[in-house]
């Protein structure tokens, strides 16, 4: 139960310059508070959805990786590219002109505050990067760990038990009007743990009086900060373990910088020109994030954009195809039903969006193989059907995909389990659960962990198993996208297969009914996901 107490009328316990705001009793220890606060220092997005991340500029104990000595130390936002062609895109986007830059951005020197019972034990300078640099600017901030006892020994091992600890935040701006909107308009913020309670204090400007609105915001932020500290410290005591781990394949900073770049370049025009009945903001920002991840993934795999030809199978509204082609990649999108959006894209994109059904080659081979066991009339009919599918211009052929093909399945439903079996590197983001026949199916859990037994987790686990059986080294990433179905299964490195494609098809119950269900999709309304 979170029931904070207003302590604004009480004397300050940490020095007369500090104004008390709120307090809350605790039953966790100093080590839990310290661990939680260090996590919040490195991830300020925990406190505000406006903030994307923090780049650590310096750490007096050198325990956090920092950006000093890199180009990132000099600017609030830098787009790093792994290849030459993107530089041409930079010329078309004058983002610096539109991005507000605070006057103290190159002020790396730590700032100081006094906390009466607690000397300084550690000083960290970070840069806060907002999600939307066009609306909010970055700011450097000193984060100081104060304590009445030593918190780390000479080997860096924590020794905080029984300590009083204060964490102060001092933003590097010299006037309250330079304070970003996502921060309280004060000189410094303090979170104080004394063993029995946690409290929030502000050091206010002596020559600037807050407006009623600013004062109200300070109160709301104090409440939010206190709640975050209480919740995360309690979680540390309870032995909280992260259930989902992000950024296992692509570095978080590289992904986020790429995402910001794409969002600044495309988001406004894509949202304003949306013609589908679905929520434009969800789809636009989700596909921009997926595009950012793919571009960084391909940067690891290929030297140049020309080295890859992508296929987005089950591409839906074609938005992801549109973004990738605009970014200089070559590829196609395939879906059983055209969408209204297709005609709103530029001609070079529209002509790459194909209204076709996907029939995996192995099903045609299976039909031909089965014909020899059928009576002559039935065999002739089966062979004619296979030949008709192989030559039908409305059927996308998976045979003969180029060697440099990369397959994408972004919530592609019926195709999700098929894509890893198509003998080309791939990334699939599972959504709805279907067997190789196209029929809806709930797969059994692949783990004894209770957290992994949902329909969705079971589907993801099944896709991983299929990928492994056919000979892919399976990688999984939980994408930073606005969707709960955000697991991406990736195959880009070949290993020894455990089964061949026909063995897998047999073990999965076969693909009987796939063609009929694929054709039926053409007559149905598209799914809104």
From Swiss-Prot:
Disordered as annotated region, ranges: 78-107
InterPro entries: tRNA_uracil_MeTrfase
Annotated keywords: Cytoplasm, Methyltransferase, S-adenosyl-L-methionine, Transferase, tRNA processing
Catalytic activity of the protein: uridine(44) in tRNA(Ser) + S-adenosyl-L-methionine = 2'-O-methyluridine(44) in tRNA(Ser) + S-adenosyl-L-homocysteine + H(+)
Compartments, as annotated in UniProt: Cytoplasm
Gene Ontology molecular function, alphabetical: tRNA (uridine) methyltransferase activity; tRNA(Ser) (uridine(44)-2'-O-)-methyltransferase activity
Family as reported in the entry's similarity comment: Belongs to the TRM44 family.
Protein name: tRNA (uracil-O(2)-)-methyltransferase
Record organism: Yarrowia lipolytica (strain CLIB 122 / E 150) (Yeast)
Organismal lineage: Eukaryota, Fungi, Dikarya, Ascomycota, Saccharomycotina
């Amino acid at each position: 139960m979170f029931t904070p107490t207003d302590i604004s009328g009480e004397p300050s316990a940490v020095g007369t310059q500090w104004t008390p705001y709120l307090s809350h009793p605790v039953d966790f220890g100093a080590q839990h508070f310290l661990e939680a606060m260090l996590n919040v220092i490195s991830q300020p997005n925990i406190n505000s959805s406006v903030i994307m991340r923090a780049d650590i500029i310096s750490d007096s104990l050198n325990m956090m990786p920092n950006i000093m000595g890199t180009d990132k130390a000099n600017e609030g936002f830098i787009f790093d590219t792994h290849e030459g062609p993107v530089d041409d895109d930079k010329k078309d986007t004058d983002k610096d002109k539109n991005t507000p830059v605070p006057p103290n951005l190159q002020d790396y020197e730590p700032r100081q505050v006094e906390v009466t019972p607690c000397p300084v034990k550690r000083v960290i300078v970070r840069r806060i990067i907002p999600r939307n640099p066009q609306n909010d600017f970055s700011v450097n901030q000193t984060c100081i760990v104060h304590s009445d006892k030593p918190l780390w020994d000479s080997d860096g091992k924590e020794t905080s038990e029984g300590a009083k600890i204060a964490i102060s935040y001092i933003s590097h701006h010299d006037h309250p009007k330079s304070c970003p909107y996502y921060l309280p308009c004060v000189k410094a913020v303090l979170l104080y743990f004394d063993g029995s309670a946690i409290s929030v204090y502000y050091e206010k400007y002596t020559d600037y009086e807050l407006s009623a609105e600013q004062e109200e915001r300070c109160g709301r932020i104090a409440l939010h900060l206190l709640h975050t500290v209480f919740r995360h410290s309690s979680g540390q005591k309870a032995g909280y373990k992260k259930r989902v781990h992000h950024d296992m394949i692509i570095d978080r900073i590289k992904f986020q910088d790429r995402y910001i770049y794409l969002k600044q370049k495309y988001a406004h025009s894509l949202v304003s020109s949306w013609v589908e009945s679905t929520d434009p903001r969800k789809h636009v920002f989700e596909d921009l994030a997926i595009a950012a991840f793919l571009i960084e993934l391909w940067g690891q795999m290929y030297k140049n954009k020309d080295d890859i030809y992508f296929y987005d199978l089950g591409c839906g509204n074609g938005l992801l195809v549109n973004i990738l082609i605009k970014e200089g990649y070559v590829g196609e999108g395939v879906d059983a039903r055209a969408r209204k959006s297709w005609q709103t894209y530029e001609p070079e994109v529209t002509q790459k969006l194909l209204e076709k059904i996907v029939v995996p080659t192995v099903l045609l081979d299976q039909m031909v193989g089965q014909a020899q066991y059928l009576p002559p009339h039935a065999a002739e009919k089966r062979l004619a059907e296979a030949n008709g599918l192989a030559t039908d211009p409305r059927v996308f052929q998976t045979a003969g995909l180029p060697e440099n093909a990369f397959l994408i399945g972004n919530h592609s439903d019926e195709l999700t389990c098929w894509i890893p079996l198509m003998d080309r590197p791939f990334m699939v983001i599972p959504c709805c659960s279907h067997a190789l026949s196209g029929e809806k199916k709930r797969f059994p859990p692949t783990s004894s962990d209770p957290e992994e037994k949902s329909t969705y987790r079971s589907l993801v686990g099944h896709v991983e198993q299929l990928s492994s059986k056919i000979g892919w080294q399976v990688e999984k990433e939980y994408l930073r996208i606005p969707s709960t179905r955000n697991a991406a299964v990736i195959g880009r490195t070949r290993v020894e297969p455990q089964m061949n494609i026909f063995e897998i098809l047999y073990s999965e119950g076969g693909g009987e009914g796939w063609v009929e269900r694929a054709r039926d999709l053409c007559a149905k309304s598209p799914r809104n996901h």
